[in-house]
């Protein structure tokens, strides 16, 4: 994750931090920081549980156990914790700039019951993989009804003309 933070400085500006898996002390410090941050209801933690940023369609999705460990610690301290899988995809659909498509999965509640860490990690990975596959299928079929446009830049002049021409009804010649 350190390499990703260096390659994408926007992540660091957004509050991203890395977990140094080579140093057990640094890993535990990052986990403690995350659990403490979850104590504030205004905080949301976005996690890349694969341990590295991978392309959206990379399969199989495999998680490291850190997410489950963090969720266990937070649930033990605060009574429960909520997890939500988020599928993010970027594609060149209608213009020469990519569109970012984000889909939120169902909320998963983890109580202070201690689940089997390995099985729960696999469950979370399969849940995210199913959401990503559904999103990819919807995109490939042109189903965009569930998506809202959050930001749209002004169309180029030729795209505006193209949209106007599509609105004009042309009657057939009857031939």
Tell what function each PLM region has.
Residues 1-25:
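Catalytic core of membrane glycerolipid acyltransferases/transacylases, capturing the structured
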Residues 24-175:
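Non-catalytic C-terminal accessory region of glycerolipid acyltransferases
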